[in-house]
């Protein structure tokens, strides 16, 4: 099976959002929430044709009457039945095509358990009958998207943050570090500190409003204490936000206090090191000969790295941690929200990649464990 004659599909399954589209495109065709909703009460919606589940945006819009579940927790698939529903929705409702006609490239979190890779492979070949399949580590794809093959990727999405050093296209597993702190936690923290101001948000519907406030108004301070002092003396950083019901709220130092948790997870009651210290720790776990190249190729990816000011702050903190002669360079490409998907699109459309696919024939001969031989 050659991937030449037909477009390969690239699906990046994140904890918060699923990004899917065609290899060779410069952006995903569809982006929707990785969520499956089931009715809380049987038979309350007359004439709905009683669907037993809803996926993505439809689940979000009906969230008042549904129980929402995210099948991917902290980057790892934990509920395969729901995951299958998300893939089904991706192929048939979002992309509107027959999966048995297209090679599929999926992404996985670093350190994804072996059994998970096999299960993914099995579902793709046995349930969806894809002609060819490949699975790639998310951070490695982000690095490809930035035009590098060596560097260290700070990938922070909705459910998990990873620091992944990569040398000549291969990740260095012994130095990969994971922090269970990402976008969802920052949204929750913002809900908490807004409630101190007297604005209460509690339901899952209200959490979406706070996520929007976070995405539109939050930023990372270059000097946190200095910023706090400034904000207490003037109202220059105050911004107003209109809620769906027309009420207008004012948000001040919460704008930079929420993302500060990335650098000081202790404010969330977490023992973890911040993203700056974790990046440094990861570099120090690598061979002394590659460190210089890693310091000068620090690449940010994922939606949680989209805060204004984050690259400058990272530059400042890492320059302070690194040896004084070391050149620290942070790359934060504007399309980094989708750089995992973009990297997948680039990889799957390379002529040299076409012999890398696991074909249906190879799968039938060797079974799911073939994935460990062909995808690394």
UniProtKB/Swiss-Prot annotation:
Role, per record: Actins are highly conserved proteins that are involved in various types of cell motility and are ubiquitously expressed in all eukaryotic cells.
PROSITE patterns named in the record: ACTINS_1, ACTINS_2, ACTINS_ACT_LIKE
InterPro entries to which the protein is assigned, alphabetical: Actin, Actin/actin-like_CS, Actin_CS, ATPase_NBD
Stated family: Belongs to the actin family.
Uppermost EC category: hydrolase
Protein name stated in the entry: Actin
Xref: CDD domains: ASKHA_NBD_actin
The protein's Enzyme Commission number: 3.6.4.-
GO molecular function annotation: ATP binding; hydrolase activity
Top-level taxon of the source organism: Eukaryota
Bridged cysteine pairs (disulfide): none
Primary subcellular site in the record, as a coarse category: cytoplasm
GO cellular component: cytoplasm; cytoskeleton
Organism for this UniProt entry: Komagataella phaffii (strain GS115 / ATCC 20864) (Yeast)
Record-linked Gene3D superfamilies: 3.30.420.40, Actin, Chain A, domain 4 (3.90.640.10)
Cell location: Cytoplasm, Cytoskeleton
Catalyses which reaction(s): ATP + H2O = ADP + phosphate + H(+)
Keywords carried by this UniProt record: ATP-binding, Cytoplasm, Cytoskeleton, Hydrolase, Nucleotide-binding
